[in-house]
């Protein structure tokens, strides 16, 4: 597996990068699977592909604080990105025959991450709902996926040294909730991992045997996707 540690200053470029990496494997330009990690330097909101802005986001607070609202290609709920939110992206090949269902794809990734975090922290980690990792029924990792015919993108977050109090300012309670949430507030529902980002990077590389640097970074395609989709209101405000 190839490894890429790359964060862009422009939030939209970080979303476009995942799609561009997915295209590399889907089109056969890169044969190896890819692990990317990145950490944002600023706060911004990311909607799931089908999320309605008004239902999921406090638009007034975001406007008042100049928080950018973007939309990703994958499903799932809205998230607040920012310092202390550690992101990973896995681009896997052979999606059509290896992972026939969305649940199979998540289980392949999240069971490995569950074992990794249990070993790292000593805490009992549970796979909750279809795509969450939690400790004591409090979520620390949310994940989403996007499937193409030959490749699969699974990406997600780990809450590390993140200011959880900000989530309730910028995000509404989600319109769709897993049963284990039980309508709890963001502060009651979420927790942070007592792990340093450098340590998590190392463990992810070990878990996925991702030691060789990706030397084909599709910068031009990333720029094009920002111009055509991720950087525009037509995409981010479509719902």
Q: Locations of the language-model features?
A:
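Active-site loop/lid in soluble adenylation, ligation, and acyl-transfer enzymes
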Residues: 1-56, 60, 64, 72, ...
């Amino acid at each position: 597996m190839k490894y890429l540690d790359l964060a862009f200053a422009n939030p939209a470029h970080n979303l476009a990068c995942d799609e561009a990496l997915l295209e590399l494997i889907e089109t056969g330009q890169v044969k190896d699977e890819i692990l990317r990690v990145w950490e944002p330097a600023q706060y911004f909101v990311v909607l799931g592909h089908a999320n309605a802005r008004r239902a999921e986001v406090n638009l007034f607070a975001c406007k008042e604080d100049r928080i950018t609202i973007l939309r990703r290609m994958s499903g799932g709920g809205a998230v607040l990105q920012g310092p202390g939110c550690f992101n990973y992206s896995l681009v896997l090949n052979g999606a059509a025959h290896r992972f026939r269902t969305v649940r199979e794809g998540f289980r392949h990734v999240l069971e490995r991450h569950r074992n990794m975090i249990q070993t790292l922290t000593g805490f009992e980690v549970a796979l909750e709902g279809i795509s969450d990792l939690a400790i004591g029924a409090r979520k620390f990792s949310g994940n989403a996926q996007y499937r193409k015919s030959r490749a699969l993108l699974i990406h997600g977050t780990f809450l590390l040294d993140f200011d959880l109090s900000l989530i309730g300012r910028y995000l509404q309670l989600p319109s769709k909730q897993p049963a284990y949430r039980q309508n709890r507030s963001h502060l009651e529902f979420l927790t942070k991992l007592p792990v340093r980002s450098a340590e998590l990077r190392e463990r992810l590389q070990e878990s996925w045997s991702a030691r060789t640097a990706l030397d084909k970074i599709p910068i031009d395609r990333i720029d094009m996707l920002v111009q055509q989709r991720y950087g525009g209101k037509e995409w981010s405000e479509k719902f």
